[in-house]
């Protein structure tokens, strides 16, 4: 399994992500061709090698012709929708922009549609977000990990005046993400960097064993007593079986409108749950009820607890910490009469399993107006024939 690990020892920002990923050796011209699919003008990109505390990295400078362009969320979503980028990149970009909009709206006590994007709406940030997601798509990795994030400290001057570090919007975006303070001063994590990394990565305190193939360094703009760099490892997981730490959240509910459970389930998945399921149970005094079970990464525990307490009638939630073992897996593409279809392939000690991606099968069924079961059945025959599963 091909993985990336973001080693954020000096924090993270949008331009640092671009620099580190380009430093891994991604084809620059191919990346620029993908950027041309974004319907925006008035910028140029300068890429150079720079030194931070005697460590060389890639610096990305996005130069904007008009520095007074401000946009709202709907403007950013329109740019994404009108681009010719893949649906996966578009969906991820929308997640990032929504995160920042929701954080800014909460801090400034307004709605997400009324937020005036002084930073986020700036063209350089649009390129930071979409450019980073394009690079990740080009790298074709199966899993992305990140270290906990250093918050920095002190104060910085912003368009609204002097604000504490981390910036309020940044800290709002980082809810549920492992962070730490170590006495360093300065803004180490930007809102854009926080939104991108919290969307794409799983945060781990201990990196699973990997064979490192490449290392990339992306330069930050400020100079600190320490190297202001983002380091990214590209490599292969060594273990056939992957171990993860998860939390299982459970609560019994017998006094809530059942219509709410559908909305609750969707919201829990949106906030980072790995699985959510409902089990009919009989409770005390013979009352029928529902056992809500949520499985999630440890980093998402507090955010999901907030959703459960906010959206249900429960007064308490049980927490069970578990180890999960996962078969090594990768995403491949196979040719079918309907075009390319992604399949998930897992393998351990000669045991091989492969399944077609549901969303690809669903799209074919809707486009061709044929039963979903026929699409899945046909693709499973191809998998069995070509992969000998």
UniProtKB/Swiss-Prot annotation:
It holds the Pfam family Ni_insertion. It comes from Dictyoglomus turgidum (strain DSM 6724 / Z-1310). Disulfide bonds: none annotated. Keywords: Nickel. Belongs to the LarC family. This is Putative nickel insertion protein. It comes from the Bacteria. The keyword Ribosomal protein does not apply. One of its GO terms (molecular function) is nickel cation binding.
């Amino acid at each position: 399994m091909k993985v990336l690990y973001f080693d954020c020892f000096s924090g993270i920002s949008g331009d640092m992500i671009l620099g580190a990923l380009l430093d891994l050796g991604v084809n620059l011209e191919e990346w620029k061709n993908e950027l041309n699919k974004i319907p925006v003008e008035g910028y140029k990109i300068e890429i150079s090698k720079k030194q931070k505390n005697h460590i060389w990295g890639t610096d990305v400078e996005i130069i904007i012709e008009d520095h007074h362009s401000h946009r709202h969320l709907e403007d950013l979503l329109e740019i994404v929708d009108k681009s010719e980028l893949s649906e996966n990149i578009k969906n991820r970009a929308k997640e990032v922009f929504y995160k920042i909009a929701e954080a800014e709206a909460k801090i400034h006590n307004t709605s997400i549609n009324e937020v005036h994007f002084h930073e986020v709406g700036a063209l350089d940030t649009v390129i930071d977000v979409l450019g980073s997601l394009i690079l990740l798509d080009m790298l074709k990795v199966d899993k992305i990990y990140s270290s906990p994030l250093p918050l920095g400290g002190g104060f910085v001057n912003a368009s609204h005046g002097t604000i504490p570090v981390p910036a309020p919007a940044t800290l709002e975006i980082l809810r549920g993400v492992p962070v730490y303070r170590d006495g360093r001063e300065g803004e180490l994590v930007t809102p854009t960097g926080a939104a991108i990394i919290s969307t794409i990565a799983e945060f781990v305190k201990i990196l699973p064993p990997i064979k490192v193939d490449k290392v990339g360094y992306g330069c930050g703009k400020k100079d600190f007593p320490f190297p202001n760099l983002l380091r990214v490892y590209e490599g292969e997981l060594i273990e056939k079986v992957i171990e993860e730490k998860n939390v299982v959240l459970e609560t019994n509910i017998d006094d809530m409108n059942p219509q709410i459970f559908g909305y609750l389930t969707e919201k829990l998945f949106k906030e980072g749950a790995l699985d959510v399921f409902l089990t009919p149970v009989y409770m005390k005094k013979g009352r029928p009820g529902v056992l809500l079970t949520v499985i999630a990464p440890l980093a998402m525990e507090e955010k999901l607890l907030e959703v459960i307490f906010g959206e249900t009638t429960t007064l308490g939630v049980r927490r069970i910490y578990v180890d999960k073992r996962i078969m090594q897996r990768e995403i491949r593409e196979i040719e079918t009469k309907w075009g390319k279809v992604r399949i998930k392939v897992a393998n351990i000690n000669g045991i091989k399993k492969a399944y077609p991606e549901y969303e690809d099968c669903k799209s074919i069924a809707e486009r061709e107006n044929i039963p979903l079961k026929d699409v899945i059945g046909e693709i499973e025959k191809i998998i069995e024939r070509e992969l000998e599963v």
